[in-house]
Each structure stands twice: as C-alpha cells, then as structure tokens.
Amino acid sequence: MSVAQSADERIPLVRRAWARCVARLLPLCATDTRTLSSRNFRDVSEEHFRRFIYNRYTEPQRHYHTLEHLEEMLGHLVAYEAEHGWHGAYKPAMAEESVSSSTPPPELLTGEDSVAYEWTGMVLLLSVLFHDVVYDPTRSDNEEASAVVAAEFLETMQRESELASNSSFGAVAAVSAASPTSMVASCALPPASDGRGAEDDVSQQHPPFSYSEPPLLWVDAQATDFVRTSTMSYILKTKEHLSVEPKQPLYLTVSAGGGFTSAELRRGSDVVQQSRDDPLHVFLDLDLTILGHPDEDTYRRRYAENIRREYSHYSRADFLRGRAEFLRGFAQHPQWYKTPYFFRLEARARHNVAHEVKALTAELAEVPVAC
C-alpha cells in the first residue's frame, strides 16, 4: 500500500467532500484535447485532488493544519447536519438529500434564496477543504493566499469542464448514433482498483450518464459567482474568527468551583434545535471545535503540541511568551462559538485554553533569560 493510499484511509470524509464538489464541477465524460488522450472523470478528479489538496496539506511544516484537521471538521459537520440541520434553508453539504428537513419552502424556489439553497453546501465544503490550503507559519497572509488558491481551483475546474464538454460532445454523439448503449459505456467510470472502499468510489456515488445528475455549477452564472465569492469570503473570515458577530449572544454561567458551564444548552434543548444558523457561523465554529475537545490530554497532544511544532522557528521563550499572550487575548472575547449547537463546547474550550496558558506561563518562568 502506498503512503498516499494509507493517508486516504484516514480521511474518508475529506474524500467524500471532494467527490461531492467535483461531481458538480466536472462532466462525467472528459477528453483532453491538448494531448488527444482520454481522461475519465476519476483521473481528472484525482489529478486535481493531489495538486490542490493532498500535496499541500502534507507539506513538512504542517503538524496541526493537516488533512486530519479537515477530517475532524467534516466529522463535526456530519454530526451537525444529522442532529440539527438547516431547517430547509439549504441543501445539506454532507448528508443525503432525502433528509426531510431539507425540503425548501416555496418562497425559496426562486431568486437569490434559490441559489443559496442549492449551493451553500458546496460553499461550506470548499471552504473547509481550502481554508488552510496555504499554511506557512512565517507569513501573515495565509488566509488571503488560501482564498486565491480556492478561486484558482474553481477557474481550473471551469476550464476542465469546458474542455471536456466541447471535446466530448462530438465523440459521444458519434458513438450514440452507432449504438445508444455504447454511449453510456463510453462515459462510464472504470471500477475502483486502488484499494479504497465504496465510500470513496466516485463511480458508485455518481453513476455515469444519469439523467438524475444535478446540473453543473457553470450553467448558472449567478450560482458560479455566488460559490466563488462566498468561498473566498468564508476563508478570509478565518483570519479573525471573533470579529464576526454571532446572531444571538449566548452566555456561560459560573459554577460553584469558579469554572464555566453551558449546561443549559444540552443536545436537544429548544435553544439548540430551534436556531436557524448562518452557514458562515457554522463554518467558523467547525474550525474551532478542537478547542472544546472533551479530553484535555487529546487537546494537548493533537492541538497545543502540534501548534508548537509548527512554530519551532521561534526561540523557546519567544514562542511561550507569544502563544500565552495570544491565548489570553482570545480568552477576553465573551463568546467563541457563534451557534447554539457548538456553543455547548464553550465551557470546555475555555477550560482547555486556560490550562494551556497556565502551562505556558509556568514553563516560561523556568526559561533562562538568555533563551
């Protein structure tokens, strides 16, 4: 088994999110007119997954901002859509469309709301996949650069789609005239032979030449602009999470021991279940879920220690001082999570961060002045 295949087994949700996006960006028949060689849907998809996602998120300077970070975010998105959902405002991003709550009310079937209903799920997935696609701890414009790469990806997919559509039309029409059944075969994807399961098999998720296939993004100029601008905007908002105001203020209560609790927002509570959340807020909350991990040791190993590795170019004292200062500033904000569903993590997140600051401060006190 190759290293890439081994990595793929750890990121089934990343693969599923990618497949769901590409199915709305590329036609299932693709012929490369530049080389006059046949390139099927799977080949084109895999080529760009390696180029835009895998190769970037496996760069050596990354320890926390990796494919596993995306996998965790998508796992929380799956749980959110299963337990809460969009109350009919948007098609689900990861859940199957058969979920009853996804049926739109009549007033959402036209205009801008219709575009948002149809395409917000893709915006969420693209934002997750691309929000850290550029990550260099020594530069301050990672978010801006990541947004540019996301736009570049969409432009690339649009060109690929146009090439495939233009070159495939004549070929498919000729085959169709000779044999209608051969036309379907000419667009079929090869069986999966790379060791990945059915979850990752694009041909099973999106059967070839199906008249039930949803239209590609590019057939609607308004939708194309919506996806491009919204995805870039979402990514740019991760530069300063807490500058985005929540829809409603949510409050922690102080426990008898002096800590915080958000027990009033238990799963299934009216506040959680009745909230109609802004997808941007959900996306930003997904990015911060690691802070509220229920196990403090896991928080330390998977987040705090890996962030420290990413900033190993700083001296020990400079890192300890800078990290503690950053977290103290973060803690001053009254509300970290913007949606009631994820606000349930707030008390635990503050506990984890407070303990990290305490550990950083204690270690800094032991560092010789010259370090």
What spans do the regions from the language model cover?
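Inter-helical turn/loop segments and adjacent helix faces that build the functional surface
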Residues: S140, L154-N166, P208-F226
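Short alpha-helical hairpin
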Residues: P27-R56
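His-Asp-centered metal-binding catalytic motifs of divalent-metal-dependent phosphohydrolases/nucleases
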Residues: M73, W119-P137, S146, S233-K239
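Secondary-structure capping and boundary motifs in well-ordered enzyme cores
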Residues: A116-M122, N142, V227, D278
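Active-site flanking loop/helix segments enriched in acidic
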Residues: H48-A79, V133-V134
